[in-house]
């Protein structure tokens, strides 16, 4: 770390935030509803193939309509991170990125070898898995909108509402031990999670720690898929 890159780190953080806000702003009109990216993802896995296709096309049409903004954010991020690396004496951002993520036990040459192994061994395996999926769902050919569809009877879905799932989790932790019961009650009572997909909510999910409170915070986008 060097204080001279602080302005670049601020700009980097601003671009990450801008990217998240852009994806959270998605309003996709589909089947009489206005959906965000997390919500339309559920329809992209539904049993109706034509509906899956239409939902996927609507989702990617939104991305296409915002292509210039995504490109601009990406371009600015590459420039910021490259400048950051150069200021710290690195050839490019790759090596610096490894250090920033504490990836100290391998380097870019090892990763290049790993990519080659993926191509040689994992890709053929993935193709065989897709062939089995194609037979399982009864299609002659898998299209891009079929890849998330795993079973002819429909993909598994959570049993019950989001509230039911939370209550089941609370009960499970109560059955495990008094300590886990106390902890999950604290998280529930202090609202230390934000779980359900809603308009203008950032995509994705994560768990992070709040050390000064000796607690975690959980962020996710429950959307009716498993």
Model-found features: residue ranges?
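Active-site-adjacent "gating/activation" loops or surface patches in catalytic cores
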Residues: 38-50, 160-225
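A well-structured
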Residues: 1-156, 166-168
């Amino acid at each position: 770390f060097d204080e001279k890159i602080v302005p670049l780190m601020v700009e980097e953080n601003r671009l990450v935030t801008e990217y998240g806000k852009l994806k959270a702003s998605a309003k996709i009109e589909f089947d009489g509803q206005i959906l965000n990216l997390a919500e339309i993802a559920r329809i992209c896995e539904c049993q109706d193939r034509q509906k899956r296709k239409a939902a996927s096309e609507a989702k990617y049409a939104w991305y296409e309509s915002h292509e210039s903004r995504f490109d601009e954010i990406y371009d600015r991020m590459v420039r910021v991170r490259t400048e950051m690396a150069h200021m710290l004496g690195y050839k490019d951002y790759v090596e610096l990125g490894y250090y920033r993520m504490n990836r100290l036990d391998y380097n870019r040459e090892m990763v290049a070898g790993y990519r080659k192994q993926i191509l040689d061994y994992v890709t053929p395996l993935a193709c065989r898995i897709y062939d089995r999926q194609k037979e399982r769902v009864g299609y002659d050919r898998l299209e891009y909108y079929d890849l998330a569809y795993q079973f002819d009877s429909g993909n598994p879905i959570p049993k019950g509402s989001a509230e039911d799932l939370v209550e089941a989790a609370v009960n499970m932790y109560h059955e495990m031990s008094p300590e886990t019961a106390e902890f999950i009650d604290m998280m529930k009572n202090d609202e230390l999670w934000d779980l359900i997909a809603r308009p203008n909510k950032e995509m994705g999910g994560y768990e992070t720690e709040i050390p000064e409170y000796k607690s975690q915070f959980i962020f996710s986008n429950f959307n009716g898929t498993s």
